[in-house]
Amino acid sequence: MSEEAAYQEDTAVQNTPADALSPVESDSNSALSTPSNKAERDDMKDFDENHEESNNYVEIPKKPASAYVTVSICCLMVAFGGFVFGWDTGTISGFVAQTDFIRRFGMKHHDGTYYLSKVRTGLIVSIFNIGCAIGGIILARLGDMYGRKMGLIVVVVIYIIGIIIQIASINKWYQYFIGRIISGLGVGGIAVLSPMLISEVSPKHIRGTLVSCYQLMITLGIFLGYCTNYGTKTYTNSVQWRVPLGLGFAWALFMIGGMTFVPESPRYLVEVGKIEEAKRSIALSNKVSADDPAVMAEVEVVQATVEAEKLAGNASWGEIFSTKTKVFQRLIMGAMIQSLQQLTGDNYFFYYGTTVFTAVGLEDSFETSIVLGIVNFASTFVGIFLVERYGRRRCLLWGAASMTACMVVFASVGVTRLWPNGKKNGSSKGAGNCMIVFTCFYLFCFATTWAPIPFVVNSETFPLRVKSKCMAIAQACNWIWGFLIGFFTPFISGAIDFYYGYVFMGCLVFSYFYVFFFVPETKGLTLEEVNTLWEEGVLPWKSPSWVPPNKRGTDYNADDLMHDDQPFYKKMFGKK
């Protein structure tokens, strides 16, 4: 027996089965041990002893960036689901300000003019998020039943059905409303399955970057949606909004076609017994031969995990409330990160940017939306670099602090120059320009940190056994907050106007402290190692110093990372 295998056997009592596995990246999120499965641990131990020779895994080496071109293109195609979501966000913000849309789906004043009431505007904009929340929980299961690829294709088809209903709407707002709910069901499934598939096929060295591409596609969709609204605003008929919807239909068809070239999740292939296909999928992702020993080793990791799952039986919804393996703690963290992403205030600008900047006296708020879309899209490229260079945790902390500063300036200028003494005081081009500048700064900070990283954190945090359930719940929290913000923003803005910015500022301050005390660093870890980090109970603010069990030296003190008796201020500002 090798020294590594001997070490793993000696530490089997104090470590989870994941510790006995290779640090090699697998397509699974973790080699899970579950709270109700003490028997599973014993079975897994027996399984490992019977396969002792396979524990001497060969790790797939890191290669130059050029070697990952193929897998990057495949992941971009999967991430195109984010473009579909972003397209809806970018176009709906303009629809509610377009004359033909208002005439068809609004109400009539006594003087013959048409308008959209706050209730109807809020419902049309935000009901999409409710559909997404339901779709994420219900339809994400398709990925477990029929594979990630087929699951994605099905939910995109559902999105297309919703688009058709919206395009076919003549003058019944509730028909358009129903279409948005159905489209939301599809996008909700996409939002869970796309990051999941990307995380499962990505090499560990670039996993964070590739998962972040989902957010990059969202920003591209928002930007091009803004541009399309700008191009159709001069029309006086339904071309204003039907052309953007029709293009959304085309984008969905493009994604379905592209999915035929994407490799299936190796984890799913192993689960259904397609071992050779799993080898080819891993080989394609890592630019190696399917007969490479490292590929065989990684398949064995997946097989061991799948075998452990089969021994344990099907995962129940109640299992997500386990505290023994920190599943419930992870779920709370994932749900909070997704909720706080919405509470940063980004959709205040994305959904109602056209309306907001009309209120500050700008002549063409559609042009302003395009500028914001460019900033948002371009900044996301920076975020793709930062997430692997500086890590998830540090980026979230930096983002919360910088966005707080931007929101303070935005709200203060609006309150003092445009809403003094709680009353609207005309408009000011100077104040409006200042607010646009700091909105751009805000969007830069958001796009580089809080926009992509919650998707990355959630895709690599949850144990394999309950992954789809936990990701769906966490994402549903994001959609629900999106609905609440989208629906109530017209009412809140009407009552307190730019004081609304201080509400988001408070949420950003809370976000900083929450990340510091509850979000661990997972940069550079395999999905199995992330599981071990959680199960060992490492304190989040000490997690950057954590070392996986099979890489520790004799002087490594694991207990030091699990306890901290320092005062509050030293935990935050003391030497780490």
Swiss-Prot record:
Its main location: membrane. InterPro entries: MFS_dom, MFS_sugar_transport-like, MFS_Sugar_Transporters, MFS_trans_sf, Sugar/inositol_transpt, Sugar_transporter_CS. One of its GO terms (cellular component) is plasma membrane. Residues 25-37 have a biased composition (Polar residues). Residues 88-122, 171-180, 229-242, 364-369, 416-437, 497 are extracellular. Coiled coil: none annotated. Low-affinity glucose transporter. Can also transport xylose. Glucose transport is thought to be mediated by two kinetically distinct systems, a glucose-repressible high-affinity system and a constitutive low-affinity system. This is Low-affinity glucose transporter HXT4. The lineage of its organism: Eukaryota, Fungi, Dikarya, Ascomycota, Saccharomycotina.
